[in-house]
């Protein structure tokens, strides 16, 4: 479900929605708990499609195991791992919160955060200062940053999103403009920007396609090479978060993701390796 309304209104709905999602994951986890080979993941919607592919690959190679993946956002991934609703929480955060300190954090991939506009937009480069100005609401018209005159449609993620948390942390913490359109996944951000010539958004580098245009940030393109080199400024790790005690099936899946086949799959889909 896309949340097409300002941040203030979306914020009031976030907590109940997150509680519902945790309950759903808890039910799934309980249903699977009796199966020795069941592995449940929940959290980051940025990593969710990649995790689903990894799960499919692992399930095919290990029919005795059933790996299931749910989204919900990084905040939910942390809470699900803490309360046992999921064996593996997924989070894409530059900084893990204090409540995750009791969890084992394993980096399984790295990802750039691409800043994207509609392909017809003539703007192809922004500085970090300009980008923050747009998301704070100080810069409201494309003509002020080299584009054609017209209001900027600011597209952001919901408050529990790891992509949003990382984006705001790297730019320097700020209060998001209340005019922003809030979306609940990378995919809906992509579709919104693809369908609005005046929009700007941010999403996982691995999900950029021909429907949108990734722009340079501080003069650096968002490419695999420049992300790996450390020159591109908007980069975050992808974590698997677990309790100390893991089932053999969960440990086997994590080992697969960190191994040559899993890392090759991650890279083939546009993300960066863990190391």
Predicted regions and their residues:
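N-terminal secretory signal peptides that target proteins for export/translocation
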Residues: 1-14
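Hydrophobic alpha-helical context, especially transmembrane and signal-peptide helices
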Residues: 2, 17-20, 34, 68
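Feature targets compositionally biased, intrinsically disordered low-complexity regions
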Residues: 7-10, 28, 33-36
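Bacterial N-terminal signal peptides
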Residues: 16-29
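Exported/periplasmic ABC-transporter solute-binding proteins
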Residues: 32-275
